[in-house]
Amino acid sequence: MADNMTTTQIEVGPGATNATINFEAGILECYERLSWQRALDYPGQDRLNRLKRKLESRIKTHNKSEPESKRMSLEERKAIGVKMMKVLLFMNPSAGIEGFEPYCMKNSSTSNCPNCNWTDYPPTPGKCLDDIEEEPENVDDPTEIVLRDMNNKDARQKIKEEVNTQKEGKFRLAIKRDIRNVVSLRVLVNGTFLKHPNGYKSLSTLHRLNAYDQSGRLVAKLVATDDLTVEDEEDGHRILNSLFERFDEGHSKPIRAAETAVGVLSQFGQEHRLSPEEGDN
Protein backbone atom coordinates (compact mmCIF):
# COMPACT_ATOMS: atom_id res chain seq x y z
CA MET A 1 0.00 0.00 0.00
CA ALA A 2 1.34 3.43 -0.89
CA ASP A 3 2.31 6.06 1.67
CA ASN A 4 -0.75 8.15 0.85
CA MET A 5 -2.94 5.24 2.03
CA THR A 6 -4.73 4.92 -1.31
CA THR A 7 -6.46 1.60 -1.87
CA THR A 8 -6.00 -0.49 -5.00
CA GLN A 9 -9.08 -2.43 -6.03
CA ILE A 10 -8.43 -5.78 -7.67
CA GLU A 11 -11.09 -7.13 -9.99
CA VAL A 12 -11.25 -10.91 -9.71
CA GLY A 13 -13.68 -11.40 -12.56
CA PRO A 14 -17.40 -12.11 -12.73
CA GLY A 15 -16.94 -15.86 -12.43
CA ALA A 16 -15.17 -15.63 -9.08
CA THR A 17 -17.61 -13.00 -7.83
CA ASN A 18 -20.60 -15.16 -8.68
CA ALA A 19 -18.98 -18.21 -7.09
CA THR A 20 -18.23 -16.28 -3.90
CA ILE A 21 -21.74 -14.83 -3.61
CA ASN A 22 -23.34 -18.20 -4.29
CA PHE A 23 -21.10 -19.94 -1.76
CA GLU A 24 -21.92 -17.38 0.94
CA ALA A 25 -25.61 -17.82 0.12
CA GLY A 26 -25.12 -21.55 0.75
CA ILE A 27 -23.55 -20.75 4.11
CA LEU A 28 -26.58 -18.58 4.91
CA GLU A 29 -28.88 -21.50 4.06
CA CYS A 30 -26.94 -23.70 6.51
CA TYR A 31 -27.16 -21.04 9.22
CA GLU A 32 -30.91 -20.78 8.70
CA ARG A 33 -31.42 -24.54 8.86
CA LEU A 34 -29.38 -24.66 12.07
CA SER A 35 -31.53 -21.87 13.47
CA TRP A 36 -34.71 -23.79 12.62
CA GLN A 37 -33.31 -26.69 14.68
CA ARG A 38 -32.84 -24.28 17.60
CA ALA A 39 -29.15 -25.16 17.57
CA LEU A 40 -27.86 -21.63 16.92
CA ASP A 41 -26.71 -19.51 19.85
CA TYR A 42 -27.09 -15.74 20.14
CA PRO A 43 -23.74 -14.82 18.49
CA GLY A 44 -24.59 -17.26 15.70
CA GLN A 45 -27.97 -15.61 15.23
CA ASP A 46 -26.18 -12.27 14.94
CA ARG A 47 -23.93 -13.65 12.22
CA LEU A 48 -26.93 -15.06 10.38
CA ASN A 49 -28.70 -11.70 10.35
CA ARG A 50 -25.54 -9.79 9.44
CA LEU A 51 -24.66 -12.20 6.61
CA LYS A 52 -28.19 -12.00 5.22
CA ARG A 53 -28.13 -8.18 5.18
CA LYS A 54 -24.74 -8.06 3.50
CA LEU A 55 -25.66 -10.70 0.93
CA GLU A 56 -28.91 -8.96 0.00
CA SER A 57 -26.99 -5.72 -0.49
CA ARG A 58 -24.20 -7.35 -2.49
CA ILE A 59 -26.61 -9.30 -4.71
CA LYS A 60 -28.58 -6.14 -5.44
CA THR A 61 -25.39 -4.32 -6.47
CA HIS A 62 -24.02 -7.25 -8.47
CA ASN A 63 -27.27 -7.84 -10.36
CA LYS A 64 -27.12 -4.30 -11.71
CA SER A 65 -23.94 -5.21 -13.58
CA GLU A 66 -25.38 -8.45 -14.97
CA PRO A 67 -27.63 -8.93 -18.01
CA GLU A 68 -31.23 -9.44 -16.95
CA SER A 69 -31.12 -13.08 -18.04
CA LYS A 70 -28.28 -13.81 -15.57
CA ARG A 71 -29.67 -12.02 -12.54
CA MET A 72 -30.49 -14.32 -9.63
CA SER A 73 -32.32 -13.92 -6.36
CA LEU A 74 -30.92 -14.83 -2.97
CA GLU A 75 -33.02 -18.01 -2.87
CA GLU A 76 -31.70 -19.13 -6.26
CA ARG A 77 -28.15 -18.51 -5.12
CA LYS A 78 -28.74 -20.48 -1.91
CA ALA A 79 -29.60 -23.58 -3.93
CA ILE A 80 -26.44 -23.22 -6.02
CA GLY A 81 -24.34 -22.55 -2.92
CA VAL A 82 -25.51 -25.73 -1.21
CA LYS A 83 -24.54 -27.72 -4.31
CA MET A 84 -21.14 -26.05 -4.29
CA MET A 85 -20.63 -27.21 -0.71
CA LYS A 86 -21.39 -30.78 -1.72
CA VAL A 87 -18.74 -30.54 -4.41
CA LEU A 88 -16.18 -29.04 -2.03
CA LEU A 89 -16.83 -31.29 0.96
CA PHE A 90 -17.49 -34.58 -0.77
CA MET A 91 -15.60 -33.98 -4.01
CA ASN A 92 -18.70 -35.11 -5.83
CA PRO A 93 -18.72 -33.74 -9.37
CA SER A 94 -22.18 -35.24 -9.87
CA ALA A 95 -23.56 -32.33 -7.83
CA GLY A 96 -23.37 -30.54 -11.16
CA ILE A 97 -22.41 -26.88 -10.92
CA GLU A 98 -21.97 -25.34 -14.33
CA GLY A 99 -18.68 -23.51 -14.55
CA PHE A 100 -17.48 -24.67 -11.14
CA GLU A 101 -15.10 -27.54 -10.47
CA PRO A 102 -12.79 -27.97 -7.45
CA TYR A 103 -9.24 -26.94 -8.29
CA CYS A 104 -7.72 -30.13 -6.89
CA MET A 105 -9.93 -32.28 -9.15
CA LYS A 106 -8.58 -30.46 -12.18
CA ASN A 107 -5.00 -30.74 -10.84
CA SER A 108 -5.04 -34.06 -8.99
CA SER A 109 -1.47 -34.89 -10.00
CA THR A 110 -0.07 -31.84 -8.23
CA SER A 111 -2.59 -31.54 -5.42
CA ASN A 112 -1.67 -32.10 -1.78
CA CYS A 113 -5.23 -33.12 -1.04
CA PRO A 114 -5.01 -36.88 -0.15
CA ASN A 115 -7.12 -38.65 -2.76
CA CYS A 116 -9.36 -35.58 -2.78
CA ASN A 117 -11.64 -37.48 -0.41
CA TRP A 118 -12.75 -35.75 2.76
CA THR A 119 -15.70 -38.01 3.57
CA ASP A 120 -13.54 -40.47 5.56
CA TYR A 121 -12.14 -37.82 7.88
CA PRO A 122 -13.47 -38.40 11.45
CA PRO A 123 -15.01 -35.46 13.28
CA THR A 124 -12.95 -33.71 15.93
CA PRO A 125 -13.40 -35.77 19.12
CA GLY A 126 -15.36 -34.12 21.90
CA LYS A 127 -16.41 -31.13 19.85
CA CYS A 128 -20.16 -30.90 19.63
CA LEU A 129 -22.12 -27.76 18.88
CA ASP A 130 -22.81 -27.10 22.55
CA ASP A 131 -19.15 -27.60 23.49
CA ILE A 132 -17.80 -24.78 21.35
CA GLU A 133 -17.63 -21.53 23.31
CA GLU A 134 -16.28 -18.24 22.12
CA GLU A 135 -13.88 -16.62 24.56
CA PRO A 136 -12.28 -13.20 24.26
CA GLU A 137 -9.48 -13.29 21.71
CA ASN A 138 -5.91 -13.32 22.97
CA VAL A 139 -4.30 -9.94 23.38
CA ASP A 140 -0.62 -9.47 24.22
CA ASP A 141 0.02 -8.22 27.75
CA PRO A 142 -3.62 -7.96 28.82
CA THR A 143 -4.46 -5.43 31.50
CA GLU A 144 -5.97 -7.00 34.60
CA ILE A 145 -7.49 -4.99 37.41
CA VAL A 146 -8.19 -6.60 40.77
CA LEU A 147 -10.26 -4.46 43.13
CA ARG A 148 -9.82 -5.88 46.63
CA ASP A 149 -11.86 -4.46 49.51
CA MET A 150 -11.90 -1.01 47.91
CA ASN A 151 -14.62 1.50 48.40
CA ASN A 152 -16.46 2.52 45.26
CA LYS A 153 -14.58 5.79 44.87
CA ASP A 154 -11.15 4.11 44.95
CA ALA A 155 -12.31 1.29 42.69
CA ARG A 156 -13.64 3.74 40.12
CA GLN A 157 -10.42 5.76 40.20
CA LYS A 158 -8.24 2.69 39.70
CA ILE A 159 -10.30 1.57 36.69
CA LYS A 160 -10.06 5.02 35.11
CA GLU A 161 -6.30 5.15 35.64
CA GLU A 162 -5.77 1.74 34.04
CA VAL A 163 -8.04 2.48 31.08
CA ASN A 164 -6.42 5.85 30.40
CA THR A 165 -2.94 4.30 30.22
CA GLN A 166 -3.92 1.86 27.48
CA LYS A 167 -1.78 1.93 24.37
CA GLU A 168 -3.30 2.42 20.96
CA GLY A 169 -4.74 -0.71 19.42
CA LYS A 170 -6.49 -3.77 20.80
CA PHE A 171 -6.74 -4.35 24.50
CA ARG A 172 -8.13 -6.86 26.92
CA LEU A 173 -9.33 -5.63 30.28
CA ALA A 174 -10.13 -8.08 33.07
CA ILE A 175 -12.04 -6.60 36.00
CA LYS A 176 -12.41 -8.55 39.25
CA ARG A 177 -14.41 -7.06 42.09
CA ASP A 178 -13.56 -8.53 45.51
CA ILE A 179 -15.74 -7.61 48.46
CA ARG A 180 -14.59 -9.06 51.78
CA ASN A 181 -12.40 -11.52 49.86
CA VAL A 182 -15.37 -12.83 47.86
CA VAL A 183 -14.96 -12.55 44.10
CA SER A 184 -18.46 -11.47 43.13
CA LEU A 185 -17.88 -10.14 39.62
CA ARG A 186 -15.53 -10.96 36.77
CA VAL A 187 -15.84 -9.21 33.43
CA LEU A 188 -13.57 -9.50 30.39
CA VAL A 189 -13.71 -6.68 27.86
CA ASN A 190 -12.07 -6.64 24.44
CA GLY A 191 -11.85 -3.43 22.48
CA THR A 192 -9.69 -1.11 20.42
CA PHE A 193 -8.37 2.25 21.54
CA LEU A 194 -7.51 5.13 19.21
CA LYS A 195 -4.88 7.72 20.04
CA HIS A 196 -5.70 11.26 18.90
CA PRO A 197 -3.18 13.96 17.86
CA ASN A 198 -3.77 15.82 21.13
CA GLY A 199 -2.76 12.71 23.08
CA TYR A 200 -6.32 11.85 24.08
CA LYS A 201 -7.28 8.17 23.86
CA SER A 202 -10.76 6.90 23.12
CA LEU A 203 -12.43 3.54 22.82
CA SER A 204 -13.29 3.10 19.14
CA THR A 205 -14.64 -0.43 19.07
CA LEU A 206 -16.11 -2.81 21.62
CA HIS A 207 -15.33 -6.27 20.27
CA ARG A 208 -16.53 -8.51 23.05
CA LEU A 209 -17.71 -8.51 26.63
CA ASN A 210 -18.02 -11.64 28.77
CA ALA A 211 -19.58 -11.74 32.26
CA TYR A 212 -18.95 -14.61 34.68
CA ASP A 213 -20.62 -15.65 37.93
CA GLN A 214 -18.82 -16.56 41.16
CA SER A 215 -18.16 -20.13 40.05
CA GLY A 216 -16.56 -18.97 36.81
CA ARG A 217 -19.53 -19.93 34.64
CA LEU A 218 -20.10 -17.71 31.62
CA VAL A 219 -23.53 -16.21 32.25
CA ALA A 220 -23.73 -13.70 29.42
CA LYS A 221 -21.66 -12.42 26.55
CA LEU A 222 -21.73 -9.70 23.96
CA VAL A 223 -20.11 -10.28 20.58
CA ALA A 224 -19.56 -7.28 18.32
CA THR A 225 -22.08 -6.95 15.50
CA ASP A 226 -22.96 -4.11 13.18
CA ASP A 227 -25.27 -2.57 15.74
CA LEU A 228 -22.92 -3.10 18.68
CA THR A 229 -19.80 -1.59 17.14
CA VAL A 230 -18.87 1.71 18.72
CA GLU A 231 -19.08 4.46 16.12
CA ASP A 232 -17.52 7.34 18.06
CA GLU A 233 -15.60 8.05 21.23
CA GLU A 234 -18.63 9.29 23.15
CA ASP A 235 -20.36 5.98 22.57
CA GLY A 236 -17.21 4.23 23.72
CA HIS A 237 -17.11 6.09 27.00
CA ARG A 238 -20.83 5.57 27.52
CA ILE A 239 -20.44 1.83 27.09
CA LEU A 240 -17.58 1.54 29.55
CA ASN A 241 -19.24 3.91 31.98
CA SER A 242 -22.42 1.85 31.93
CA LEU A 243 -20.30 -1.08 33.06
CA PHE A 244 -18.34 0.83 35.69
CA GLU A 245 -21.49 2.37 37.14
CA ARG A 246 -22.44 -1.08 38.33
CA PHE A 247 -19.72 -0.67 40.95
CA ASP A 248 -21.28 2.54 42.22
CA GLU A 249 -24.83 1.55 43.02
CA GLY A 250 -24.15 0.86 46.68
CA HIS A 251 -25.61 -2.63 46.90
CA SER A 252 -25.33 -4.17 50.36
CA LYS A 253 -24.87 -7.57 48.74
CA PRO A 254 -22.09 -8.46 46.26
CA ILE A 255 -22.67 -7.30 42.69
CA ARG A 256 -23.66 -10.20 40.47
CA ALA A 257 -22.29 -10.80 37.00
CA ALA A 258 -25.73 -11.50 35.56
CA GLU A 259 -27.01 -8.15 36.83
CA THR A 260 -24.03 -6.42 35.26
CA ALA A 261 -24.60 -8.17 31.94
CA VAL A 262 -28.26 -7.15 31.93
CA GLY A 263 -27.23 -3.56 32.66
CA VAL A 264 -24.80 -3.46 29.74
CA LEU A 265 -27.17 -5.26 27.39
CA SER A 266 -29.95 -2.82 28.21
CA GLN A 267 -27.79 0.02 26.88
CA PHE A 268 -28.26 -1.52 23.44
CA GLY A 269 -31.79 -2.84 23.85
CA GLN A 270 -30.28 -6.31 23.48
CA GLU A 271 -31.75 -8.06 26.53
CA HIS A 272 -33.05 -10.83 24.27
CA ARG A 273 -29.49 -12.18 24.11
CA LEU A 274 -29.96 -13.57 27.61
CA SER A 275 -31.82 -16.80 28.16
CA PRO A 276 -34.87 -16.57 30.46
CA GLU A 277 -32.86 -18.27 33.22
CA GLU A 278 -30.03 -15.75 32.93
CA GLY A 279 -32.45 -12.86 32.80
CA ASP A 280 -34.01 -13.99 36.08
CA ASN A 281 -30.66 -14.31 37.86
Curated annotation (Swiss-Prot):
It is found in: Host cytoplasm; Host nucleus. Transmembrane segments: none annotated. Residues 1-103 are annotated as: G1P2-binding. The keyword Ribonucleoprotein does not apply. Coiled coil: none annotated. One of its GO terms (cellular component) is host cell cytoplasm. A motif (Nuclear localization signal) lies at residues 50-55. One of its GO terms (biological process) is symbiont-mediated suppression of host ISG15-protein conjugation. Residues 1-93 are annotated as: RNA-binding and homodimerization. Signal peptide: none annotated. Its main location: host cell. GO terms for molecular function: protein serine/threonine kinase inhibitor activity; RNA binding. Keywords: Host cytoplasm, Host nucleus, Host-virus interaction, Inhibition of host innate immune response by virus, Inhibition of host interferon signaling pathway by virus, Inhibition of host ISG15 by virus, Inhibition of host PKR by virus, Interferon antiviral system evasion, RNA-binding, Viral immunoevasion. Disulfide bonds: none annotated. InterPro entries: NS1, uS15_NS1_RNA-bd_sf. Binds and inhibits the conjugation of the ubiquitin-like G1P2/ISG15 protein to its target proteins. Since G1P2/ISG15 is an early antiviral protein, NS1 may inhibit the host antiviral response. Prevents EIF2AK2/PKR activation, either by binding double strand RNA or by interacting directly with EIF2AK2/PKR. Also binds poly(A) and U6 snRNA. Belongs to the influenza B viruses NS1 family. Homodimer. Interacts with and inhibits human G1P2 conjugation by UBE1L. This is Non-structural protein 1. It comes from Influenza B virus (strain B/Maryland/1959). The gene is NS.
